[in-house]
Amino acid sequence: MSRRQTCSLLLIAFGLFYLVPLSNHGLWIPDETRYAQISQAMLLGGDWVSPHFLGLRYFEKPVAGYWMIALGQAVFGENLFGVRIASVVATALSVLLAYLLARRLWRDPRTSLACALLYASFGLIAGQSGYANLDPQFTFWVNLSLVALWHALDARSRRARLLGWTLLGLACGMGFLTKGFLAWLLPVLVALPYMLWQRRWRELLGYGALAVLAALLVCLPWALAVHAREADYWRFFFWHEHIRRFAGEDAQHSRPWWFYLPLLAVSCLPWSGLLPSALRQAWHERRQAPVVFLALWLLLPLAFFSLSRGKLPTYIMPCLLPLALLMGHALVQRLRLGNSVALRGNGLLNLGLALLALAALAYLQLRKPVYQEEPFELFLVLLVIGAWAAAGLAQWRYPLRAWAAPLLASWVLIALLPAAMPNHVVQNKTPDLFVAEHLDELTGARHLLSNDLGAASALAWRLRRSDVTLYDTRGELKYGLSYPEHSQRSVPLADIRQWLWRARQDGSVAVLLRINSASDRYQLALLPGDGERYRNGNLVLAILPQVRP
């Protein structure tokens, strides 16, 4: 197949598997609705400096990630595609970086293509590409910073070296504006030991200053602007989002130190069977500069994230590009040698996982059905399992010819699985679809009330309003609600009837509740019995008409 044919086929696959599904399912709570609402508020209100969630100060992240999601909504509309396109673009750019870095390291087109394809089809990378959060963007900036570092170190001219270090600084600056100080730490974790090993520490000191200057030029304008606007921003952001999350006893998402070790293997699916041979080859080539650089990039950030108390699966996404390159390099070496053992093992693993998934689905459907009168969704999930099994079988039977078969498994999974979700999951996790069904009833509401931040942000995004009052909940908006001018934005359980009486004198009130527990049912029971009610799964929408004083 010619290069033009390969590129055309990959572009078609990108559109079919990555772009088309973006508009086919609602926004998942809590992340997608939160980021959609924050960025929409920037777009509508014009405040591009201080992040606000539901009109309240929200200082958990800087602003660049919100800017990109807002840009997507500005260009493509305030819709599902517009909210998610930033993640797809960031992922596509990271795939391009994988290709370019592999080409620079090994100067072999086949290896470059294999590395890019593996990275694009890693389960965690492909799955997050259609999900509106900040991790794909942050991962791109970290990837760019370290690719720029290698280009600077491998440069043959002073001009190219200067460009590489400058690009490193710019990428660190944008990474910082996306997710914070980690964007500075991760490149240092790799650059410092590598350049000491290379005995190039003077170059690190000299050109590193240029990178720091470039990063500061990117960061300082916003850093000073947000400090002038919100004097408490940096205290909260540094201590709450960095120190407490890394070392605090009450850190969010606390996990054991070994949490990321099995997750790393799972993140590589459907290529996890190649992991042992890739690591073994990396050990044999441990004195080669490219392998040392990639190993440091993989292992040192992984160790840092493992030491942190707060852990989420997406935190290790910056570790996956070097792993894809090590695996792609090992894969092509085995193809050239005609060694099919690892490929057969990978195919057998995927086939086994597909059969296990099929058996689990059959068991659940017989004992406690996951899909109830949902033949289309059940057909889609069977199609996903079938594609995974077919890819595994093909790679097992014809490992040297069908080495790329796992691409099909991964891409069919990300394209169809969101649409294959059971209705009870969709109803619970994507409340914006329920809100969209009742826009006519909601448009005239004077006040909005919700007992759940995910539902509240879905309501706010669909109605293009930030003034949703919180009903007996605070969550991650506890800090924003602590400001005196916003104390009335949350109503405790004991005051709800009085609040509703006063609010209904101004106009109608729309109440969106998620009912997941006995306390939620009690919240629903406290609402007046008049007005219209609509229910979908565990979501209840009550439209309470205006009352006279």
From Swiss-Prot:
Principal localisation: membrane
Membrane topology classification: Multi-pass membrane protein
GO molecular function, one term: mannosyltransferase activity
GO biological process terms on file: lipid A biosynthetic process; lipopolysaccharide biosynthetic process; protein O-linked glycosylation; response to iron(III) ion
GO CC annotation: plasma membrane
PANTHER family from the UniProt entry: MANNOSYLTRANSFERASE YKCB-RELATED, UNDECAPRENYL PHOSPHATE-ALPHA-4-AMINO-4-DEOXY-L-ARABINOSE ARABINOSYL TRANSFERASE
Protein's UniProt name: Undecaprenyl phosphate-alpha-4-amino-4-deoxy-L-arabinose arabinosyl transferase
